Amino acid sequence: MGNNRPMPTLVLSCEHAVCSVPEWYRERFKDSQDVLTSHLGWDPGALNLGQAFAMKFHTPLTHGEITRLLIDLDLAPDNPRRFSDFVAGLSGDQLARMQERHLGAYLETLRQRITSGIHVSPPVVHLSVHTFSPESGLVPPATDIVILSQGGRPNEVLLSGAWVAALRNAAPDLAI
């Protein structure tokens, strides 16, 4: 008998994959390399982890191509915090172009992959890969893995709970 449900489509993303700065914005970071290369500028290791998941599950990885200190791809297009202080002084047109070129293109790629997944093999599971540093204060210092879910989404909470249970069973020494 068994479970006849189709395998869900996995959509992988990594918003804070790099700390790259396009040539035309480099002057803004000339005295801020430490900030740019810190966890404030990107999620070190997240791109490698996302690529490993993509290879393991034979699915593409959608990832950011610029530092979150220019525009944070993890924030909504209307969130005023999506732009950092490093873009202060740019005109509205410049900010709109940056948003369209980076955030808009990124979100459109994700939408296309999710829509395609819904048509091919629903349901779709979207996994966004991040890393946290102890300095961020976002996780307890001795934490190895964090699985986040949005409380208002019951299926997401169930999947996250099952994943945590499976990880604890497979690797009881990890702090999850």
Where are these regions (language model features)?
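N-terminal catalytic or cofactor-binding beta/alpha core of small enzyme domains
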Residues: 1-176
